[in-house]
Each structure stands twice: as structure tokens, then as C-alpha cells.
Amino acid sequence: MADLKQFAEQLVNLTVKEVNELATILKDEYGIEPAAAAVVVAAGGGDGAAEEAQTEFTVVLKDAGASKLAVVKLVKELTGLGLKEAKDVVDGAPSNVKEGVSKEEAEGLKKSLEEAGATVELK
């Protein structure tokens, strides 16, 4: 039992590079697709490199603020949603405005929405 706890401790403390190497070994030598490898990193392993390596972001509308109509129009324009769908996104805050976007696009969306009076968070 102590060996398993020690193994678990080592697994949780792997760096992102080490997790990638482990994934390659599991795939190449054992034919195992390590879909859960990212879970180990997300569980707190590594040295914070997981945050630096993030390439896709989600733009989350926390609050529309006082200019709700302007935010609805902007969400409609930025996402290509219809007016009703954009209104539903704004009314349902906190809600995801756009998912899986690059850092640059996410920051641009955040800036635009904040200029319209909304409170926005990037995840």
C-alpha cells in the first residue's frame, strides 16, 4: 500500500514535460492511449507550466453591467448568434460567450465587452 501511495505522489508531481513523455511511452510501448494524462496535470502536478501552455481560452460573461442592450448587440456581433440567442447568453450570466479561442482573440473579446460595460473573465 505504501508503494502505491508513493507512486501516486510521484505521478501527481510530474511536470508537463514528464507527463508528455509518459504519454508517449504508454502509447508507443504499451498501445495505451493516455486520455487521462491531462487530468494528472490539472490535478496539481507540475510546476505551473500547465497554465503557461494554455492555448485555448473561454470568454465568460460574468455580468452585463448597466448597458445590457449594448452588451447583447455586441455578443450578437462577436459570436454570430441571433438576437434571441445573444440575449439568452447575456441574461444567463455567468455564461460562456465563446469557447476554444486563442489568447489574442479572447483578450480582444474581453476588451470589447468590457468597453461596453460588461464584466468578463478568461478561463
From Swiss-Prot:
KW Ribosomal protein (keyword) present: yes
Comp. bias regions, Basic and acidic residues: 100-114
Region described as Disordered: 96-123
Cellular-component GO terms for this entry: cytosolic large ribosomal subunit
InterPro entries the UniProt entry points to: Ribosomal_bL12, Ribosomal_bL12_C, Ribosomal_bL12_C/ClpS-like, Ribosomal_bL12_oligo, Ribosomal_bL12_oligo_N_sf
GO biological process, one term: translation
Keywords: Ribonucleoprotein, Ribosomal protein
GO molecular function annotations of the record: mRNA binding; structural constituent of ribosome
Keyword Transmembrane helix: no
Stated role: Forms part of the ribosomal stalk which helps the ribosome interact with GTP-bound translation factors. Is thus essential for accurate translation.
Subunit structure, interactors included: Homodimer. Part of the ribosomal stalk of the 50S ribosomal subunit. Forms a multimeric L10(L12)X complex, where L10 forms an elongated spine to which 2 to 4 L12 dimers bind in a sequential fashion. Binds GTP-bound translation factors.
Entry similarity comment: Belongs to the bacterial ribosomal protein bL12 family.
UniProt name for this protein: Large ribosomal subunit protein bL12
Organism: Flavobacterium johnsoniae (strain ATCC 17061 / DSM 2064 / JCM 8514 / BCRC 14874 / CCUG 350202 / NBRC 14942 / NCIMB 11054 / UW101) (Cytophaga johnsonae)
Gene: rplL
